Amino acid sequence: VDWPTAAFWQELAGVYPDAKIILSTRSPESWYKSISETILAAVWAPDKWPAPAVEWFRMASKVIARSLGDAQDKDAIIAAFTAHEAAVKATIPANRLLVHSAKDGWEPLCAFLGVPVPDTPYPRTNSKDEFFEHIKKADDI
């Protein structure tokens, strides 16, 4: 599950002890670039968004503080990302955990979930442009 739900991975893993956990991974620098150009950029300027999105950003800023600490400090954010990955790997048993990068594609993901590999290309979604389009659509809610 994408952010912000991923900030509550420990609670969710405890409530669903038989659930399989997929840890989406990427380089810390590429993750920081992505989050700083999307979630953090939006949270730092919530008043420029439609009213329904503003409430979401207020919630998001609380989750960011809980999971990343000082969202203005790149080194602290990257350290939180690295600590998050290490904690998930140290906590979740190997039979419940798949560490997956989008570049790995369908095969390891489908094998882990016990489902057939689709005949469609692995999706590329959640881009910066898509992120901001979703926020703009909040005005239609």
Give the label of every model feature segment.
Residues 8-76, 107-115:
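PAPS-dependent sulfotransferase catalytic domain
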Residues 69-72, 84, 88:
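Short, positively charged, low-complexity/disordered linker segments
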Residues 22-34, 39, 49, 86-141:
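The conserved 3'-phosphoadenosine-5'-phosphosulfate
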Residues 7-10, 84-86:
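A generic local structural motif
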